């Protein structure tokens, strides 16, 4: 049976909503619907699975391993499992994107430094 969920019904706030697959029948994917203000984003971290960023509006600077990627709306950034990564919104307006975790739950290890 299909499930239909309104964005506002997902846990979170005005800048981030979270979907965990384990809470929706064990679907093997989780994601954030993100709207990051300029200069905001997570510090470097890793996941034991790949993460895919789909940019809908704005732009961001992504750290992926030793690489820096400038990405804008219409781009997809894929970070392999275990690779240190993070991003900061670089556009004058919010960076709107979907951050897809290829797991039914989100596991994050923050990197010092």
Question: Where do the model's predicted regions map?
Answer:
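Short acidic-glycine-tyrosine-enriched beta hairpin
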Residues: 67-81
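Conserved short histidine dyad/triad with adjacent acidic residue
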Residues: 32-47
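Glycine- and acidic-residue-biased ligand/ion/polar-headgroup-sensing regions
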Residues: 50, 55-60, 65
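Ligand-binding loop in jelly-roll beta-barrel domains
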Residues: 81-107
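A short, N-terminal "cap"/entry segment at the start of jelly-roll beta-barrel domains
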Residues: 1-29, 109-113
């Amino acid at each position: 049976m299909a499930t239909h969920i309104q964005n506002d019904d997902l846990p979170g706030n005005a800048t981030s909503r979270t979907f965990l697959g384990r809470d929706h029948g064990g679907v093997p994917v989780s994601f954030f619907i993100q709207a990051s203000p300029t200069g905001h984003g997570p510090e470097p971290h890793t996941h034991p699975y790949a993460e895919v960023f789909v940019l809908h509006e704005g732009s961001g600077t992504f750290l992926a391993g030793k690489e820096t990627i400038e990405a804008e709306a219409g781009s997809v950034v894929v970070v392999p499992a275990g690779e240190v990564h993070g991003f900061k919104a670089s556009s004058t307006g919010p960076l709107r994107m979907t951050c897809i975790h290829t797991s039914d739950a989100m596991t994050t290890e923050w990197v010092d430094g």
